[in-house]
Amino acid sequence: MEDSSQGSFVATINEDYEAICWGCGLNLVLPSYAPVFKCGWCGAITNQNPVRPETKSFGLRRFRDRCFVVILAVFMLFVICGGIWAAYPVLFSISLACGIFHSVTTATLAISTLSTFILVAFKCAGKPTNILYGTHPGVGNGALNNYTFCNYCSKPKSPRTHHCRTCGMCVLDMDHHCPFIGNCVGAGNHKYFIAFLISAVISTSYAAVMCVYTLIHILPPIEKGAAYASDVAHVAHGNSISILRVVKNICLTYIANAVFISVRSLVLVYLFVASVSVAIGLSVLLWQQLSYIYEGKTYLSHLSSQGTEEDGEKSCRNLLTFFGCPHSIERHLPTIRNLRKRHKT
């Protein structure tokens, strides 16, 4: 009886569990087994059940990205070259000054869009700095606070760093991986990505306006009867029904005469539809990006903070800091904010 009671007593004692911290190399004594634990010296977080790296679909993802990059580059060149071929003979026929003005505008927007696209596609998205790890004498107290170990790169990974399996590297302040540029958007090229979106939205909006302006000068005139004149008169007074009726009559007239429409007109119509569609999509993306920057977040940090009480500091300073504005401008922001609070009270 004594042996059995003694054996049951020993079985209830919890044995200490030893583990090694990858950050400083110290042997840690844990009260029990824990799949994830944090070192009390260096602050590194160790995951004892790491996810095994997968490299099977790496080549397929890279091939997909290259295809998207080629498609986007061809589309941009088609919009530029197709617009020049279809619109500029008409613009120069209106007046020489008109043609020169739009030529300079097109060249400026094309250079801006293509240069920012090249920068965001080929510039490093943000390689994290190398940091010493693995040896206790070289790693100070709290030097690797909240760092984790990337099993893909076999390097330390800071809380602001995420690994991209498509690019095959860790990216500092990673926002997302964009297949249309074949690159990640991170600390190294985020500003160029925003500049590319702004330039692309302005360029596509300008292309849509120029397509409409050119089509007005080359499409056959509409037969204007008494009903058409009456509808136009009501449009002048803001009648929405008359506006829809006028647009309907114009569309039906051009559809009926589609056989007589030139190839130049068809190209302009396609460019208009494509430009408007792309401009709307990029405008939504640009607004989303600026909203995250205003909140002091990235897209990935926004996803990770969902369902929690973590909320970034919403301030215009985040936008000014992101774009590298001088500190003299930031000094006036608290004054403006305080004035708004005083007016509210």
Swiss-Prot record:
UniProt keyword Coiled coil present: no
Membrane topology (UniProt): Multi-pass membrane protein
Subcellular location, principal: membrane
E.C. designation(s): 2.3.1.225
Subcellular location: Vacuole membrane
GO molecular function, a single term: protein-cysteine S-palmitoyltransferase activity
UniProt keyword Transferase present: yes
Catalytic machinery residues: C178
Residues of the DHHC domain: 148-198
Swiss-Prot/TrEMBL keywords: Acyltransferase, Lipoprotein, Membrane, Palmitate, Transferase, Transmembrane, Transmembrane helix, Vacuole
GO cellular component, one term: vacuolar membrane
Segments passing through the bilayer: 67-87, 91-111, 192-212, 266-286
InterPro entries cross-referenced by the UniProt entry: Palmitoyltrfase_DHHC, PFA4/ZDH16/20/ERF2-like
PANTHER family for the chain: PALMITOYLTRANSFERASE ZDHHC16
Family classification: Belongs to the DHHC palmitoyltransferase family.
Domains: entry comment: The DHHC domain is required for palmitoyltransferase activity.
Protein known as: Protein S-acyltransferase 11
